[in-house]
Amino acid sequence: MENNIENQCIPYNCLNNPEVEILGIERSNSNVAAEIGLGLSRLLVSRIPLGDFILGLFDVIWGAIGPSQWDIFLEQIELLIGQRIEEFARNQAISRLQGLSNLYRIYTNAFKNWEVDPTNPALREEMRIQFNDMNSALTTAIPLFSVQGYEIPLLSVYVQAANLHLSVLRDVSVFGQRWGFDVATINSRYNDLTRLIGEYTDYAVRWYNTGLNRLPRNEGVRGWARFNRFRRELTISVLDIISFFQNYDSRLYPIPTIYQLTREVYTDPVINITDYRVTPSFESIENSAIRSPHLMDFLNNIIIDTDLIRGVHYWAGHRVTSHFTGSSQVISSPQYGITANAEPSRTIAPSTFPGLNLFYRTLSDPFFRRSDNIMPTLGINVVQGVGFIQPNNGEVLYRRRGTVDSLDELPIDGENSLVGYSHRLSHVTLTRSLYNTNITSLPTFVWTHHSATDRNIIYPDVITQIPLVKSFSLTSGTSVVRGPGFTGGDIIRTNVNGNVLSMSLNFSNTSLQRYRVRVRYAASQTMVMRVNVGGSTTFDQGFPSTMSANGSLTSQSFRFAEFPVGISTSGSQTAGISISNNPGRQTFHLDRIEFIPVDATFEAEYDLERAQKAVNSLFTSSNQIELKTDVTDYHIDQVSNLVDCLSDEFCLDEKRELSEKVKHAKRLSDERNLLQDPNFRGINRQPDRGWRGSTDITIQGGDDVFKENYVTLPGTFDECYPTYLYQKIDESKLKAYNRYQLRGYIEDSQDLEIYLIRYNAKHETVNVPGTGSLWPLSVESPIGRCGEPNRCVPHLEWNPDLDCSCRDGEKCAHHSHHFSLDIDVGCTDLQEDLGVWVVFKIKTQEGYARLGNLEFIEEKPLIGEALSRVKRAEKKWRDKREKLQLETKRVYTEAKEAVDALFVDSQYDRLQADTNIGMIHAADRLVHQIHEAYLPELPFIPGINVVIFEELENRISTALSLYDARNVIKNGDFNNGLSCWNVKGHVDVVEQNNHRSVLVVPEWEAEVSQTIRVCPGRGYILRVTAYKEGYGEGCVTIHEIENNTDELKFKNCEEEEVYPTDTGTCNDYTAHQGTAGSTDSCNSRNIRYEDAYEMNTTASVNYKPTYEEERYTDVQGDNHCEYDRGYVNYRPVPAGYVTKELEYFPETDKVWIEIGETEGKFIVDNVELLLMEE
C-alpha cells in the first residue's frame, strides 16, 4: 500500500469543496433556489383551479420566502458567474421583493374574502383597489430587476416578479367583470398581458444566453461543471418558468391546462473536479456528455460494464435502452465508454409497476487518487458504485451506494418521494479520458421533468398540451432541433411536403368526445397543414407566415394554427401532422399540439367569440363608421357566414346584433367600390355601363366558395379571340393623385390575365390551383334541404392570408386565391375621360377562371416618390399623345383618300369600275396604320382614334361587300373549304394564320371545278391569284359546253406573259409590274395590287412558307390580333403569289371553271368572275 496520503482512496465528500475553490462561497444553501424554482414549476404544471392557483402562488413563493431566502436566491447566480451584486442594488432588489410579497399577501386575503361573498359591493371594490395597487407596484418594480450591469445576477428574481405580474393580469382578465371593472379596462389589461408575455419571455431568453456565453469554456471538468450548473439551475429557475408564460393568456386557455416540460438537465459530475490539469477538456466533455436533440425517450434499462485498474473496480462503459412516448419499440444507444468484463455486466432497470417504473434519485460513490509526480503512479478519477432509487425508495444497485446525492441538485417537494419527486432519470452518458498517467471515467446523469409522462394522455375536461418531441416517428426531412429557450424543450424542424410525424395518443374518454385542435408553429412562408387523429381529420387549412426568412426564433415568431374543423375520437389513436404546400422545401418549426375539449355550450361560446372578433376587426374603430382598407368584400362575406352559423339556441340576441353590424359593413363595402354591378347581375346589359364581355362567360349564383354571384371564364381556341371581361371606371369617380386597388377572390384559374389600364397597362397572369370540391367526403352533405349550400359545414381552406406577390408582368405559378393589383392616377380631366380600364382575359385553350367579389377602391393619396413617378408617367403619356395626334392626322388623310378612290362618289354605294381586290386591300392597310383605335391589351376596347378608324373601316367593309357581290363564283376564296366545288382526285384546303385558306392541288390528275350561271352576251373578268411550285403549269380554265374556251396559266417562272396585251418574258413582266405609268388596264390593276403586297413572282423553293400567311407588323405594336377588328376574312396575300385575269364573253347561260395542273403543286388563293359594268 502506498504511504503517501495523496495516493490513498479519498472519499469524495472528504475533499475540499470544489465550489470553495472556484468562488469561495459555501455550498450549503445552493439548493434553496432550486427548491423555489421547482416548487413554482410544480404549481404551474398542476391542474388546480384559478382561485387555488392564486393562493398557491402565495403559499409556495411569495408567502414562503423572506428577505434571507431572497438573499440566497440572488447568491445562486453570483456563485455561478463570479459576479457579486453591489450592496445597494442587492438591498434595493430584496426590499422590492419583500414589498411585493407584502402587497400580494393583502391581495390574496382580499381575494379569499371576495370568494366567500362575490356579490358584496365593498369586497368587489376592495378587489379593484388591490388589483390596481398590485399592478402598479409590479409595473414599477420589474424594471428595477433589470438594472444595467446586473441583468444576469438579477435574472431569476426578474422572472419571479414577471410571473407574478402575468398571474395578476390573468386574474383581472378572468374575474374583472365580477369585480366591477368595465369591459374597456379589462380589454386594456388583457392587451397588457399578451404584450408582456412576449416582452418578459424574450428578455429572459436573451440574458440567459448572454450569461451562458460569457462563461469561460476551459479548465476541463471544473469549468464544465460550472457551465453546466449555470445551464441547469437557470433552466429550472428561468427557462422552465417563462415557458409557461403563454398559458397565462386567459382567452387562449380559459380552462385548466396540462403542461409538460420535455427539456433535459444534467446533474454535476460525481467525480473529483479540482485538478483540471489532468481531466478531459471542456469541449470533450460537452460533446460526449450532452445529448444531441432527439425525440423524447424514457429509460428501460442501463447495462453497465465494469473494469479493474490497480485494484479499483469502476464504471467503465454502458449501453442504454429506452422507448419513445407511447411506443413499445426498444431503442438502443451506442456503447458509451469501453466494453469491459472485470465483473459481469449489471443491468439496472426500474420496476415495471406503474408509478415505480422510474428512478428519481442517484447516490454515487466516486473514487479519486491523484498521480504522484515523484513516484509515478496512475491517477484515477472514477465511479465505483451507484444506488438508483425508485419513488418508493426501492433501490437498484450498481455495486454499492455512495454519498453524492442527486437530490442536492434536484430536490423533492416535501418528504413523500412518491408524489414529491421533480425529475426522472432518462439517460446516462459517459466521458472517458486517458491523459499521461491519469484515467477519468465520468458518467453524467440526464434528467427529465416529472410533468412529461411516457404516455400522451388527453383528458376531456382540460386543455392538453403535447410537445411534438413526444412523437414516436419522424419522416425524412424532419428533425429535432434545440428549442429557442421558451418552449420547455426541443422542437421539430421540417421541410417536407407531405407527412411530418406520427405520435401515439390516449384519450381518456371512452365515448366519442369532440376536441378542437391547434398547433404552435413558426414559418417564414404561408403553410397548409392538417392533423389526422385515427379516422378523424381537421382537413387542410392555410396559415400565414410568422417571421421573416432566416429570422431568429423569438416568442413573436410562434403562432397557433387553429383548425376550425374539430375531431371526434376516443381511446388509443395514432395521430399525424402533414404539410401539403411546400414544393420549394421551405423550413417550418413546430412546437406542440393542443387538444381543447368542446361541448355544445363551449362550442357555441367559442363560435360567438370568434364571430365577435371577426366582426369587430372589420372596422377601423369601435364606432364602426369606416371599414379597414385591407378588409375585402370576400372577407365580409365570410364573416357573414360565421354570424349566420351561430347557434340560435345559445346566442340569438348576439347573433342579431352581429348580423346588423356585418350588413352595415357590406353596405360600406358597396359604397366604396367604384365598379358598377360588382355582383354580376348581368353582362352586356347596357352599352355604356357595367360589364362587357364575351358571350361564353357565365354568371353563377352563390355556392360553397362565393356567397354572391361569380363569373366563370372558359378558355379559347384562338388567342386573337380571347375570352374577356372588362369595365371602365369613369374619370368622374377618380380623385387626382391617388392610388387605387383592384382586388377580388379567385376560386381557381389558369392563364388568367388581369389588366389595369390608364397611362399604360399594369398586368399580371395568375394561376390559382383549385382542389375540386371544398367538401370532404367524410362530412355531412354541403347541400341544405332546399338545395342551398350549407356554409356551416366544415370545409377545406386554402391560403387565406397570403397576398399576391407577383411583380408586374410576371406569370406566377401559384397565387393566393386573394388577388390585388394597384394603379396610380395623376391629374384628372373630365373632358378626356381617360378613366381606368379593368380587364380580365384568357387567350389559351387550357385557360379558365372562376372569380368574384371584385372591388376597385381608393387606397391612399400619393406622396413622395410615388407622386413623382405618376407625374413623370403622365407627362410621358401626354408627350406621346401629342406625337400620335400629328401622326394620326397624316395617316388618316392618306387612308381616307385611298378609301374614297374605291367608290364612285361620296354616297359610298358603288365601286369604281376598275376597283379590284388589291386596291381594297391596299386601302385597308392604310386604314390599319391608324394607331390606338383599340387598346392593344384587348382589341374590343375603343381607343382614342376609334371614331376615325371605324369610319374608314366601315367603308372598307362596304367596298368588300360590293366587290363580293360582283363575283359570281361561290366560295371563290376557299374559306368554306371545298363547298360549292366539284373535286376529282386528291386536293387540300389549307387554313393559314388568321382564318385565311388556300386551295392546294398537289397531283396532276386532280381537278376542281364549279358550274356557274351567267348572262349571255355580257362581259366578265376572270381573275385568279395563285402560285405555282415546282415544274409544270397550273391552269384555271373557263369554258362553255362547246368551244369558247380560255385559260390562265401559272408557272414557277413565266417565260412569256399570258395576258393577251403583253408578250414580255418573266423578267420583263416583273420589271413591268413596277412601271407606274403603264396604260394597260389589266396591268394597271396588277400594279396596284403588287404595290400593296410587294409581290415577288420569283417563287421560293420551300413549299411551306410560300402560302403561309404573314401578319401585319405595323398595327398596335406587338399585338398581331388587332387587325381582326372589322376585317376578318380578307388578309394580305403573301409575297410570291401572282394575280392574272382575262376577259370572257359567254354565249350561253352556263360556264364551267376548272382548276388543275400538269406537275408539281398548284396553290390557289382566290378565283373571281366579275360582271363588267354596262
Curated annotation (Swiss-Prot):
Keywords: Sporulation, Toxin, Virulence. The keyword Ribosomal protein does not apply. Pfam families: Cry1Ac_D5, Cry1Ac_dom-VII, Endotoxin_C, Endotoxin_C2, Endotoxin_M, Endotoxin_N. Coiled coil: none annotated. InterPro entries: Cry1Ac-like_dom-VII, Cry_V, Galactose-bd-like_sf, Pest_crys, Pest_crys_Cry1Aa_dom-IV, Pest_crys_dom-III, Pest_crys_dom_I, Pest_crys_N_sf. It comes from the Bacteria. GO terms for biological process: sporulation resulting in formation of a cellular spore; symbiont-mediated killing of host cell. GO terms for molecular function: signaling receptor binding; toxin activity. Gene3D superfamilies: Galactose-binding domain-like, Pesticidal crystal protein, central domain, Pesticidal crystal protein, N-terminal domain. Belongs to the delta endotoxin family. Toxic segment of the protein is located in the N-terminus. Promotes colloidosmotic lysis by binding to the midgut epithelial cells of many lepidopteran larvae. This is Pesticidal crystal protein Cry1Eb.
